[in-house]
């Protein structure tokens, strides 16, 4: 069954948990087949697209192009149009309503839609408008989400020239912010960076590369040249001194980031620029960091660095401070340094791990972890603490 704009409006009115999914589905929905053949002279959206991308049309003055586009869209959207627009092409109405509604619910839905919706006609009409409005109002989270979507896009339905313009405009905004208000640049840039995902083609980005590598000057008017992976992005990042003012934007970025390279940037900058300040790290913040809903080797490594960097955090106090379970959790880390730290902690401070925990860890393929488990199991009473069932499970595993 095909979704309609009316279905979306009803879902919004009832605060349906699936509202975002409905919007994404409608944006990707194929246009319905007309009941009767279309007249060759009839105005259609596809004809409109064919015209605006034709060389002859693009050769006309900009003002003439704009006037023609506005008039044709008016005719296509008219109630008496011979061929009504497909429902997906009307999605801009819903997205703009989400933007004008200032409730927290609408804001949450809008940001999720921006993150997931395909960059196609219909939604794009609203997103472009919101981009400009967010820029004018200095709405960093909204502008950052839209800018990152444009920077990550590979093949949008609209013209690549439009996409490149939006990328350049977004970086120009950040650059001017860094030049005129450097104190707020890291906060704004953090919201931009937080919106990138792990499937980003980093070598093809424009905004992210400027944030990371602006001082390499290895860029032209529309794209960067090759940046070696060995390049120190902390030395070549834009507005380096602004980032070094306070750790707060980087700490927030670490909790917001959706991509591992962004987390690494934040952690590396914190280690390099704020090692002294972080010697007095708040225990609760460290606990909150460990409980972020993401598996990250970068964060695991950073947690170990924080524990080792702070003289007030002694391993004997970890249970009392609430850090014991965090370090035990690092036994499952994919980061070798974090895993090694956790293994040594267990040997020194936690040889009393429950048998159920040891049996669960025994399923992990890591050789160093298997050695630890064997060592701890050998210290337990084979009948009273382990039992036949546990021995049966262990003997079925290759490392035991």
Regions found by a protein language model. Give the residues of each.
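Extended amphipathic alpha-helical repeat scaffolds
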Residues: 1-243, 254-263, 269-276, 290-297, ...
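Hydrophobic core positions within HEAT/HEAT-like alpha-solenoid repeats
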Residues: 266-267, 300-304, 342-343, 373-374
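Amphipathic alpha-helical scaffolding segments
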Residues: 268-273, 284-285, 347-349, 364
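Amphipathic alpha-helical scaffolding segments comprising HEAT/armadillo-like alpha-solenoid repeats
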Residues: 186-190, 244-253, 276-288, 312-329, ...
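Structural signature of alpha-helical solenoid repeat scaffolds
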Residues: 271, 304-308, 347, 378
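Amphipathic alpha-helical segments within extended alpha-helical solenoids and repeat-rich scaffolds
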Residues: 326-327, 398-400
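Short leucine-rich amphipathic alpha-helices used at interfaces
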Residues: 233-234, 239-241, 316, 341, ...
């Amino acid at each position: 069954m095909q979704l309609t704009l009316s279905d979306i409006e009803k879902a919004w009115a009832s605060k349906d948990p699936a509202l975002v999914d409905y919007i994404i589905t409608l944006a990707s929905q194929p246009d319905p087949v007309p009941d009767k053949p279309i007249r060759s002279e009839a105005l259609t959206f596809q004809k409109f697209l064919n015209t605006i991308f034709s060389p002859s049309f693009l050769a006309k003055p900009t003002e003439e192009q704009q006037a023609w586009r506005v008039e044709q869209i008016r005719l296509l959207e008219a109630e008496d149009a011979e061929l009504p627009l497909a429902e997906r092409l009307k999605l801009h109405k819903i997205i703009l309503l989400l933007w004008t509604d200032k409730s927290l619910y609408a804001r949450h839905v809008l940001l999720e839609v921006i993150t997931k919706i395909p960059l196609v006609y219909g939604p794009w009409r609203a997103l472009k408008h919101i981009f400009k409005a967010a820029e004018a109002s200095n709405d960093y989270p909204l502008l950052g989400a839209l800018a990152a979507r444009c920077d990550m896009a590979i093949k949008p339905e609209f013209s690549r020239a439009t996409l490149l313009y939006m990328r350049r405009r977004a970086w120009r905004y950040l650059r001017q912010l860094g030049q005129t208000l450097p104190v707020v640049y890291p906060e704004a840039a953090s919201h931009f960076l937080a919106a990138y995902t792990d499937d980003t083609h980093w070598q093809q980005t424009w905004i992210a590369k400027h944030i990371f590598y602006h001082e390499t000057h290895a860029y032209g008017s529309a794209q960067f040249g090759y940046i070696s992976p060995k390049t120190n992005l902390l030395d070549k990042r834009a507005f380096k001194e602004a980032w070094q003012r306070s750790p707060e934007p980087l700490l927030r970025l670490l909790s917001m980031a959706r991509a591992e390279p962004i987390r690494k940037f934040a952690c590396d900058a914190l280690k390099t620029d704020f090692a002294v300040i972080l010697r007095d790290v708040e225990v609760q913040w460290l606990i909150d960091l460990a409980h972020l809903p993401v598996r990250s080797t970068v964060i695991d490594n950073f947690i170990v660095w924080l524990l080792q960097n702070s003289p007030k955090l002694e391993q004997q106090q970890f249970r009392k401070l609430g850090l014991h379970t965090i370090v035990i959790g690092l036994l499952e880390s994919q980061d070798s340094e974090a895993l090694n730290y956790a293994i040594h902690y267990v040997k020194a401070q936690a040889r009393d791990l429950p048998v159920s925990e040891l049996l669960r860890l025994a399923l992990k393929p890591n050789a160093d972890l298997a050695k630890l488990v064997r060592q701890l199991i050998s210290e337990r009473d084979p009948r009273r603490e382990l039992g036949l069932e546990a021995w049966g499970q262990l003997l079925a595993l290759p490392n035991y």
